[in-house]
């Protein structure tokens, strides 16, 4: 079902009775489309819930991908919908972190080639790159697909955001110089990146929290 444009609608249609079952029995159960998370006080109870889900899906002509089924205890971290939950700490998942760093790296190479091929100046090159990622990270007001409205309200640490910030700065310096080394900090200072519309995720996160904490 995942990957289909109407997958969320289909999941809601087929799983609404299962949602009602868990809700009526006061079981800690969360679902987004066909991603399901269930909490329990002990392993026996959890296995019982898992079997209930399996039975319901089989009776409905559906199935579970065994490669995406995990049982974990509260001391372990779990990744769910792009988040990593580790005790009371909620951060961006390692998989999501790897994906966004990959996109940044590919974009940096692309903009470096574009800059050289078209003989584009440093500032407009970085402005264009930042426009792309600022739209992804911050979007427009109430853009639910942007990181600002998807991740910011739920994470409670800036560890991953800080890592992305540093990686983004490194890649943008590479776009200008064509190399990765410590001298880039002098050749392309932070103020220059800001002049090119670069926005720090950590800074934007704290601004978002200050504006939205009641």
Which positions does each model-derived feature cover?
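Non-catalytic terminal/accessory segments
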Residues: 1-33, 37-214
């Amino acid at each position: 079902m995942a990957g289909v444009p109407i997958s969320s609608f289909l999941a809601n249609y087929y799983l609404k009775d299962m949602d009602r079952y868990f809700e009526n029995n006061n079981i800690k159960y969360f679902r987004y489309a066909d991603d399901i998370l269930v909490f329990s006080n002990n392993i026996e109870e959890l296995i019982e819930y898992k079997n209930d889900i399996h039975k319901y899906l089989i009776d409905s002509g559906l199935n579970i991908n065994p490669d995406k089924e995990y049982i974990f205890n509260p001391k372990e971290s779990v990744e769910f919908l792009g988040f990593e939950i580790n005790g009371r700490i909620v951060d961006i998942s390692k998989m999501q972190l790897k994906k966004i760093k990959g996109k940044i790296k590919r974009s940096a190479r692309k903009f470096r080639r574009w800059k050289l091929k078209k003989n584009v100046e440093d500032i407009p090159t970085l402005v264009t790159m930042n426009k792309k990622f600022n739209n992804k990270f911050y979007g427009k007001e109430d853009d639910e697909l942007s990181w600002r409205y998807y991740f910011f309200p739920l994470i409670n640490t800036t560890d991953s955001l800080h890592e992305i910030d540093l990686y983004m700065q490194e890649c943008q310096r590479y776009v200008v110089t064509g190399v990765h080394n410590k001298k880039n900090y002098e050749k392309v200072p932070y103020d220059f990146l800001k002049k090119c519309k670069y926005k720090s995720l950590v800074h934007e996160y704290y601004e978002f929290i200050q504006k939205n904490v009641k």
